[in-house]
Curated annotation (Swiss-Prot):
It is found in: Cytoplasm. Residues 207-242 form the UVR domain. Gene3D superfamilies: 5' to 3' exonuclease, C-terminal subdomain (1.10.150.20), GIY-YIG endonuclease (3.40.1440.10), UVR domain (4.10.860.10), UvrC, RNAse H endonuclease domain (3.30.420.340). This is UvrABC system protein C.
């Protein structure tokens, strides 16, 4: 612990209760560093300050603690719920176990009548009315399923605003992925049947679908409707192809299977999802964990995952190690999601197969991550030797714009586990002279560190000038930050970078230096993040700025134009006659728009 805070901390530890509750670790300025729960507050909190702690993350946390606050609860379940609420509210830096905490992807069937749409999105949108299917472990797997649904059942996936404006079928109809309900080329009854079949497919009811398609194909052939028979035959072939690729189990029901593994400082949790007897896939997580007991670590991960990331919990959670607080976690999940949840570590038959599959995947994933982890640790170690101080967290800023247009500042965050994408931030720069990178960097740094905690190393891309400006910002904010400026070498070639320090010294690392490789990795990621966000902002601005120059064309009609033609490129390609079709434009405005866009 910090030596200045030792007397105060020791006094707190001596007076701690042995009741269950929640504890909060606070930093020098009173900022919340970490929230934890405990069955026995005295034992748990005191364990952070024993000399045998070896985990670097725990050591870094303890070194920053200046104060501790506790809240006593009536039970461990209550402590768990309170802990997760505090984490969700404050997002303490040492509680963030998941580097990328995006919600899972779900496939959604809307309740729009008479022509529902099928789409995908992250999380269960509470503003949406309809049916959700999932979770899918990645956007790719959800898109793959949507593509199959398009080919099988031709259900629309377009936005309602686009759908309502159509006057003729779009490209999806031409390539046989939509039945064009927008222009009435399919009856509501036939479309409803396609939607219901899509839902049955998503629910895993493919056996009956198979039989129905066979019956329809045979009936069409008997009626000498050979085109229709070929249509059903093609659908049947595609359905069987999809079935062959899916892992389908005889046991119905829903379950998440979680397997944890730990090796050489790397923790991996593999989650597999089974819904309606179908394996939807899985995802590997590499959380930052404080602890050395696998059961407790998995329990902490599950609390974090199901309370902070997941939109739902299945009725059954199968784990590869017993949890010390299984009952408390079951009760907390039941309260949170309003359903009974069972956590099982001893299973047989099909469930044992699921668990074996998850364990096989977690071992495979941790081996792949381990080599990356060891290389990254070595890079951090060499950088620590170069700068002469311990480094756990690095933040790097970059500015991106096109001739001063749509400036964006990015901030990326790395620690010894790699990129912390959930900590990334972007800043839309405003009210500066176009192209003034110094002013842009000043604004970004000021906005970031007015509230956020300083990292162990702040990398400034831009060299000596930007570094001096950053020093001024820190002085104005009353902060002491360890900063290094990075300037590119002659010809801006990688490997010739120079590091500038706040005391005026500078060094140039050899091209094969692992410390240099880490700096390049962080800087390049900051550049990638900045330029990606800048291009999106620039393109969005350009798509509307051309239309904004047209007199008499207000925001609503600009929006209608873009919606009708699918974007600015569609508007530019449209003829004068096609422009008149847009509701509310009329011939005069259509002629004006066409003339201005094509002068």
């Amino acid at each position: 612990m910090n030596q200045n805070a030792r007397p105060h901390i020791e006094k707190i530890l001596a007076n701690l209760t042995q009741l269950p509750g929640v504890y909060k670790m606070l930093g020098k300025e009173g900022e919340l560093l970490y929230v934890g729960k405990a069955k026995n507050l005295k034992n748990r909190v005191s364990s952070y300050f024993v000399k045998t702690i070896e985990h670097p993350k725990t050591q870094a946390l303890v070194a920053r603690i200046y104060d501790i606050e506790t809240l006593v609860t009536r039970s461990e379940t209550e402590a768990l719920l309170l802990e997760q609420n505090l984490i969700k509210q404050h997002r303490p830096p040492y509680n963030i176990m998941l580097r990328d905490d995006k919600s899972y992807v779900y496939i959604f069937v809307s309740a729009d009548k008479p022509y529902p749409r099928i789409a995908s999105g992250r999380g269960k949108g509470k503003h949406q009315i309809g049916k959700f299917f999932g979770p899918y472990p990645s956007a790719y797997s959800a898109r793959d399923t949507l593509l199959v649904l398009q080919k099988l059942f031709n259900v629309r996936q377009c936005e309602n605003s686009y759908f309502s404006q159509r006057k003729r079928p779009c490209l999806q109809y031409q390539i046989k992925r939509c039945s064009a309900p927008c222009v009435g080329l399919v009856s509501p009854e036939d479309y409803k049947e396609d939607v219901n079949n899509s839902i049955r497919f998503l629910q895993g009811d493919t056996k009956e679908l198979n039989q129905e398609l066979i019956a329809k194909m045979e009936q069409a052939a008997a009626d000498l409707e050979f085109e229709k028979a070929v249509f059903y035959r093609d659908r049947l072939s595609l359905l069987r192809e999809v079935q062959a690729q899916q892992a389908v189990f005889k046991v119905k029901g829903e379950a998440d299977i979680l397997a944890i593994a730990y090796q050489a400082g790397v923790t991996c949790v593999q989650i597999m999802h089974v819904r309606n007897g179908r394996m939807l896939g899985g995802k590997s997580y590499f959380p930052d964990m404080l602890g050395d007991d696998l059961g407790q670590m998995l329990s902490d991960f599950m609390a974090n995952f199901y309370f902070q990331v997941a939109d739902e919990v299945p009725s059954e959670l199968i784990v590869n190690t017993a949890l010390p607080d299984r009952k408390e976690l079951e009760e907390a999940l039941a309260q949170q999601f309003g359903k009974k949840v069972q956590i099982k570590s001893s299973v047989r038959e099909t469930r044992a197969e699921w668990l074996e599959l998850a364990e096989m995947n977690v071992q495979h994933a941790i081996k792949g991550q381990l080599s990356n982890h060891l290389e990254l640790n070595e890079r951090f170690h060499q950088l620590e030797q170069v700068v002469g101080r311990p480094i756990d967290r690095i933040e790097c800023f970059d500015i991106s714009h096109t001739m001063g247009e749509a400036p964006i500042a990015s901030c990326v965050v790395f620690d010894q586990g790699g990129a912390r994408k959930r900590d990334y931030r972007q800043f839309a720069i405003q009210d500066i002279t176009a192209g003034d990178d110094y002013a842009a960097m000043r604004q970004a740094l000021t906005r970031r560190y007015k509230k956020a905690m300083l990292p162990d190393l702040l990398l400034i891309d831009g060299g000596k000038g930007q570094l001096h400006m950053a020093m001024e910002v820190m002085q104005e904010l009353g902060l002491e930050a360890f900063m290094v400026g990075v300037s590119k070498g002659e010809g801006r070639k990688p490997g010739l970078e120079t590091l500038h320090f706040t005391d005026g010294t500078k060094i140039q690392l050899p091209e094969d230096s692992k410390a240099l490789h880490l700096i390049q990795q962080v800087r390049d990621e900051a550049h990638r993040f900045a330029i990606t966000k800048h291009r999106a902002k620039r393109d969005k601005r350009r798509s509307t700025s051309v239309l904004e120059a047209i007199p008499g064309l207000g925001p609503k009609r600009r929006r209608d134009l873009l919606t009708h033609f699918g974007g600015i490129q569609g508007v530019l390609k449209a003829s004068e006659k096609e422009l008149t079709v847009v509701p509310g434009l009329g011939e005069v405005m259509a002629r004006t728009i066409y003339k201005i866009l094509h002068e």
